[in-house]
Amino acid sequence: MSVNSDSPILRIVVVISVMVMSQGCDKLGLGTSPTQPSGPPAAGSTVVYSAVGASDANGVGSSVPCAPFDTQCENGMGYVPVTTRQLRAQGFNVTLLNLGIPTAVIGRDFQTLGQQYNRIIAGNFIDQEMMFVQPNATLVTIFAGINEVNVVTAALGGGAGGSDPNGYMDAQVRAFGTDYTTLLAGIRTRAGSPRIVVLNLPNPAGLPYLAGTSLAQRQAAQRIAVAMTRTVVNPLLSSNLVVVDLMCDSRSYIPSFYSSDGLHPNDAGYAYIASEVVKAITSSSYPAPQNSCPAMTIVP
């Protein structure tokens, strides 16, 4: 999720942090990584947790957001630190590395596209986060999609797609899928087979930040998000990858779960997300995501 472009301090911190980490650290393949698929962690075990994400991982919109690369942020109210505290309360010994970068998108292609249409994007998951996943990670969470939807709708508003906007949107969804494949492959190259929890995205057409926009923009956002969920994220479900279904959970559309910008969750919204992430981490039978639900057709 994006941060407010009127926050210069946050932008400076993000850009400097990305530059330092990009220049000062290694690429893939460091250390010894696990090789066996990871199911739910055993009760009381050690959980080595890497969180890949954008401003949602930092808890932007909450009462206690975490600064970029404040890898612990013990009192943060975003879903990543709340998840960590809940796991510890259940007896797990959790080591957290929060890699979230506000404004980030999944890959360089979306970063370049967004910058072309004047969106502030400080980095991407593949280039600035994937390489820092702990080699001994036993748990990785990933939340991508909303910033990418906003990039594509901004491009459409700037004339991209020409006479075939649907074809353009569908091509961007395929690019998102390619990037997701690259991201997961890189994480597994680095960390072996950790338990991976990915979050599909809610339908932006039902979120407060688009409430005052045109029907065409909401239709475009819905088309992109639903396609990303159905064709990219949900099919990732496997024995060691769990999908949290934000798209079809009615709680994703409760207005009071969002901060004043209408995009980022507030404390209540992040608490809801964290509760589902914890269940996905610890359950041996977490429900599969739905591929059809009323939330997929919020606008006609």
Where are these regions (language model features)?
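Structural recognition of the beta-strand scaffold that forms the well-ordered cores
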Residues: 48-59, 95-100, 138-143, 148-151, ...
